[in-house]
């Protein structure tokens, strides 16, 4: 999975797909009451990027629904995963539940269309810290109350704050969640980061019987040398400001035999087991 990073304006969606992304990540900004308002990152952000591009959240969902609905004139078959970077750290953790209700409702109304020809992409909920876990409970509660639990099959969870892996596991156990789990490791592109935690994450993923990590991605990678390092370790995904560079690296002999771009037929919630 090549995840285009910080794709926050509507016109950026197709640009990142044209560069080779098959997944996009966008920031969801909330008001003080936990209402999702905009796709917006703000200052500071990654080096070399414009931090203030944005769209109204519901309008953005309307657009990506079209891009991921077969038969729609805007349909792009390559876009298979939407990663919502939920900016919950900007609001009180007591509002995490309200935020989960709001995001689930807006996805039902503007993306899934409550079963009437909605978008088909998988949804990854990127949650900053384990203390925001009530967002997940609220999201699942809302799908159940609204009679649309079928969409749980399309939804995955990821904690992005580089926290202790055992603390993350404990929270997932508390929530009763042991599937559809990604684990990210990374930092803003301007700052160097070693591989110590990433190696631990991959080791957990590859431990037989360990349920709390199915897929792993590294972020935000901009240099081809760091992309090679992460791919050599065996990540499932790379988040980048430059999907075209990831595409070039994947074509190198060392990686072209081992990796290919994920398509809609690939399940993003299953552990990959090489044949």
UniProtKB/Swiss-Prot annotation:
GO cellular component, one term: extracellular region
Function: Dermonecrotic toxins cleave the phosphodiester linkage between the phosphate and headgroup of certain phospholipids (sphingolipid and lysolipid substrates), forming an alcohol (often choline) and a cyclic phosphate. This toxin acts on sphingomyelin (SM). It may also act on ceramide phosphoethanolamine (CPE), lysophosphatidylcholine (LPC) and lysophosphatidylethanolamine (LPE), but not on lysophosphatidylserine (LPS), and lysophosphatidylglycerol (LPG). It acts by transphosphatidylation, releasing exclusively cyclic phosphate products as second products.
Annotated protein name in UniProt: Dermonecrotic toxin SpeSicTox-betaIIA1
Stretches assigned to coiled coil: none
Disulfide-bonded cysteines: 45-51, 47-190
Binding residues annotated for Mg(2+), in chain numbering: 25, 27, 85
Family: Belongs to the arthropod phospholipase D family. Class II subfamily.
Keyword field: Cytolysis, Dermonecrotic toxin, Disulfide bond, Hemolysis, Lipid degradation, Lipid metabolism, Lyase, Magnesium, Metal-binding, Secreted, Toxin
Organism phylogeny: Eukaryota, Metazoa, Ecdysozoa, Arthropoda, Chelicerata
Biological process according to GO: killing of cells of another organism; lipid catabolic process
Tissue distribution: Expressed by the venom gland.
UniProt EC number: 4.6.1.-
Cofactor note: Binds 1 Mg(2+) ion per subunit.
Cofactor: Mg(2+)
UniProt source species: Sicarius peruensis (Six-eyed sand spider)
One MF term in the entry's GO annotations: metal ion binding
Annotated catalysed reactions: an N-(acyl)-sphingosylphosphocholine = an N-(acyl)-sphingosyl-1,3-cyclic phosphate + choline; an N-(acyl)-sphingosylphosphoethanolamine = an N-(acyl)-sphingosyl-1,3-cyclic phosphate + ethanolamine; a 1-acyl-sn-glycero-3-phosphocholine = a 1-acyl-sn-glycero-2,3-cyclic phosphate + choline; a 1-acyl-sn-glycero-3-phosphoethanolamine = a 1-acyl-sn-glycero-2,3-cyclic phosphate + ethanolamine
Location of this chain's protein in the cell: Secreted
């Amino acid at each position: 999975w090549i995840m285009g990073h910080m794709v926050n304006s509507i016109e950026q969606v197709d640009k990142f797909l044209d560069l080779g992304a098959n997944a996009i990540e966008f920031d969801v900004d909330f008001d003080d009451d936990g209402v999702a308002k905009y796709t917006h990152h703000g200052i500071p952000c990654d080096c070399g990027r414009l931090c203030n591009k944005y769209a109204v959240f519901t309008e953005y969902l309307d657009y990506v629904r079209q891009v991921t609905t077969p038969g729609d004139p805007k349909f792009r078959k390559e876009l298979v995963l939407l990663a919502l970077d939920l900016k919950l750290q900007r609001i009180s953790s007591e509002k995490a539940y309200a935020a989960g209700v709001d995001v689930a409702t807006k996805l039902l109304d503007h993306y899934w269309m409550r079963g009437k020809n909605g978008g088909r992409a998988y949804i990854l909920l990127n949650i900053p810290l384990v203390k925001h876990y009530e967002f997940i409970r609220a999201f699942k509660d809302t799908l159940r109350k609204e009679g649309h639990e079928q969409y749980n099959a399309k939804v995955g969870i990821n904690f992005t704050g580089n926290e202790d892996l055992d603390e993350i596991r404990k929270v997932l156990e508390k929530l009763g969640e042991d599937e559809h789990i990604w684990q990210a490791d990374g930092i803003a592109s301007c700052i160097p980061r070693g591989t110590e935690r990433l190696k631990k994450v991959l080791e957990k993923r590859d431990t037989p019987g360990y349920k709390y990590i199915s897929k792993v991605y590294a972020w935000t990678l901009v240099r081809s040398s760091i992309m090679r390092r992460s791919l050599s370790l065996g990540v499932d995904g790379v988040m980048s400001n430059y999907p075209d560079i990831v595409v070039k690296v994947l074509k190198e002999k060392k990686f072209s035999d081992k990796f290919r771009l994920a398509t809609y037929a690939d399940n993003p919630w299953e552990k990959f087991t090489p044949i």
